[in-house]
């Protein structure tokens, strides 16, 4: 089935064909997102407009097009200064003097000292993702932030659903990790994560580890393209249908929140796209058909 045909059918949420965090998230850099100002010492990022150069400590291939990159913070005893759910802006200057700026969400713990970790997928026409993949250990990249999209508070909701695809997993993983790392936070979490193939499932080991340790609190469902599933694949195959979501999700309620992050096709089919960086837009797609509205859904 062709990509155009897949994305033209509003009944389904499609496994990821390819989208950068930049393509789904440049809208992060907006007046809707606020730069989080933290005055405490011991944090590399405290908000504001100052770009900070961090040295690449380690670059490790995870798949043919995905790297795990570790950057050194300004001081070995520093934490990043990020909170859940927030991200950083990255910048590099082209040989012609043009700035390329994209947002990325770290996968490291907020209290991790000395380093900052990212999982970044390379795309053929992705200027920043190609630049980052070409960085050599010891070279630097400019960062600033953090930019907070949703400030999580323990037990904000009785339950949440995290629906994402591809690189859209990063802010959803932040929420999953934050909730399960706090014994006082009893929020139940359902993660529904779609990708093209099993090899494309990012940070699966981390997600599976959390799910195994919190079986009564966390449920994870993976989807991959039907033509890409291997014989030993234990997740779901094909599309994430409205019928699946109807069985999996709680009914619309003030105690239940859905967070969505992925490429444009996923937004269109699941939740509707954002009107602008400052406007979440109306809920469309499968979630609208299931009775959800703006107060129930947040689009990263």
Swiss-Prot record:
Disulphide linkage map: none
First-level EC class: oxidoreductase
GO MF, one annotated term: cytochrome-b5 reductase activity, acting on NAD(P)H
Binding positions (FAD): 156-191
Gene Ontology BP term (one): ergosterol biosynthetic process
Cofactor(s) for this UniProt protein: FAD
Reactions this protein catalyses: 2 Fe(III)-[cytochrome b5] + NADH = 2 Fe(II)-[cytochrome b5] + NAD(+) + H(+)
Membrane-traversing stretches: 12-29
Chain coiled-coil ranges: none
Highest taxon in the source lineage: Eukaryota
Name this protein carries in UniProt: NADH-cytochrome b5 reductase 2
Organism of derivation: Lodderomyces elongisporus (strain ATCC 11503 / CBS 2605 / JCM 1781 / NBRC 1676 / NRRL YB-4239)
